[in-house]
Amino acid sequence: MPGTSLPSAGQWFSWILEDLQPTPARLASSLRIVLAVVLGLILLLVLQVPFVSLPVYLIFVVGRESPAVSLRSTLFPLGLACVAVAVELVVVIGTDNDPMIRLLSVAVITFAAGALAQASNFAPLAPTFGFLYCLVIALWENQTPADTIVKTSLYLIAAEGLTLGSAVLVEYLFASRSAVDRLREQFAIRHRALETMFRGYARSASQDELFAAYLPVARLALAGQRGMQDLYHVVVQRNLDPKGLPIGMRVRITLLAELVDVSAAFGASHLATDDPQLRERCAWIADRCRELEESFESPKNYLGMSKSGISALRHVEDTLEAITAMPARSADSEDDKLSVLPVRKIPFLVPGALSAKSTFTFGLKISFCATLCYILYHALDYPEISTAVTTVLVSGLTTTGAMKQKLAHRLAGAIFGGVLLGLGSIVFLFPHMDSITALCGLIAVVTFIAAWSAAGRRFGYIGLQIAFSFFAVTLATLSAPTELAPARDRLVGIGLALLIMWFVFDQVWPVRTITMMRQALASVLRGEAQLLSVSRTEAQSPSFASTIDGLRHHVSTKITEIRNLHEAVLYEFGVDREPHKVAGEIILRAALNSSSLFWNELVLLETPQGRNLLALDGIVEIRQILAKRLDALAQDILEEAPVQPLGVEDQRVSEDSPERVYLDTLRSSYARIETILLTLPARTETHLAIDQRDSRSAGL
């Protein structure tokens, strides 16, 4: 069926080649990783520390946006390792090393890790702790003296300290300039590239000139938003001075990344044009990009002509209008607090997440899969396949599409890194290596390949798995490997986890990616409704600031999440993909366009002049009506019911009053969201399939 057809092998190969193209700062980052890995490996081998593969791999997950962030990001895994060892010793000593208690502790810890991965704003910490705990508690399943196991557990902390310290040292030696300046530069690079490309279309440049202008845009599209989001997190974590960054910086990064993507799609399909209207539309886009490059802002000068014709160009115009609809900075320095949200103001738990059924359901699924893998490999007396538990904890995601994406990438990385590179090195290279110099040379080459691949947008996770698999096969012990079984056993463990997770996540408790996108969009709309429901008294209360900070972080995170989930729809192999892809596009557009409504309202509530508007009955009434409509839209999206138009008109605000300008802007923002959602399918194939399956089960 056409709806279920997958991309061809040629298409996948083309995407992989695109993902490996050079992008800004990719080479420098890869070389720093190589240097840190080699330095850490030398220290571990010279000091004869038992753990080698895992601590060396952790260098890949260290933040590299600034030396301070590198130090902070190394303290977390090091601290988690200490906590994991402490909990391990408490469980073993407190229960006299009872095997049943050890097993139950694995189930409880993995459940907590899965639940906190959903409920926490610092999600990576929980799975990391779960993985480290399962690693050290499994040592007690072996017939080894207790003092040896305790020393081995402590060696894990020492090994992590050496390798992560090497990574921090390298980052401090090659420190870069301010993250704020680099973030501004990244915005300027993208705006400049977009202006150049669309200016070429506006003046009917030759095909060669257009292609030359298209290439930088295509490479920036391949880079995605991760680099800019990483720089944003540096500013947040270090509480740096925003230095005039625009309001709503995190959402603007997502909007700009989407603008680059749709512009690259247009440039790839149109390398020449003679249409006068298209040239005029491209000139309008180029002008807006130039204004954004100069000041991050552009007048709300919407395109005055029809957007009919080329759909790719229409998407560019829609995204650009969503950017220009964002609020502009004023001369007030108070706007700095609206640019970035310092990490100290981000709540640890997502509001309402602990009471959500989905949080505990996900924790149960992760716990069931990890515990079952743990039982199987110990019952079979086959500890070499312990990678099954690792796969569950690092690949367990909420949606079937995202999970399949990560599992497929993990399997591909294990085959390439563990079998081809790892097994190939053991067979062909290790017999001829007789010094640490030769080993470091081999590790450096493979590390560079893995680091370069890990910087990709679509397949970056494969690079991480290449490194993890290669290190696990070749650096399993302090001596040179002499057997071929480790590579085989790693794949067996991964295959076992794939089978169990496929059954649990895809067959028993499936959550489709489009369903999560609907839930995320509904959460965004309800957050905006909550903002519109704020009264003047509430806006002046002492607790208002903390409430708004949490809501602001939640909405921004959900909009970014929707864009990431949109890319995972491609991996929904088992369902009718085309309707889901269409619905995903609509949900993404609605989320991006809703950002301007949220941020304009947030600016209104942060200023005394704006709060004074909340005392006017006409404005309060319309805000309440729109808040109810946004709540109703959110409910319609969750239930997949048809979206109904608003059709509300007020009579309390005169046509020529300043308040009318605010209301017109508010109505316009809502109308854009509603217009997009009116095209959202009312019911997808996912629910039909589930309903049919439930009816068959009831009949049985």
What are these regions (language model features)?
Residues 1-34, 38, 46, 67, ...:
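Long, hydrophobic alpha-helical segments that serve as membrane-spanning/inserting helices
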Residues 90, 94-100, 104, 429-437:
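Membrane interface segments of multi-pass transport proteins and intramembrane proteases
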